[in-house]
Amino acid sequence: YLTDHYFKVDLNSTVTQQRFLLDPSELAGITIMQPSDSNIEWLKQYRDDVATWLENS
């Protein structure tokens, strides 16, 4: 499920510069700013990885 806690994703930065706001006690959605085909798949995979991590934490 999605909550009011979202990743704040700056797609103009590199992966190592990504700034995330995450409440680890809840499954988080992603707010995508300036989406493009080149980064949508990466974001989906990252979201899935985080969801898995949260479920296993």
Curated annotation (Swiss-Prot):
Its cofactor is Zn(2+). It is found in: Cell membrane. Its EC number is 3.4.11.7. GO terms for biological process: proteolysis. Signal peptide: none annotated. GO terms for molecular function: aminopeptidase activity; metal ion binding; metallopeptidase activity. It catalyses: Release of N-terminal glutamate (and to a lesser extent aspartate) from a peptide. This is Aminopeptidase A. It is a single-pass type II membrane protein. Belongs to the peptidase M1 family. It comes from the Eukaryota. Residues 1-57 are extracellular. GO terms for cellular component: plasma membrane.
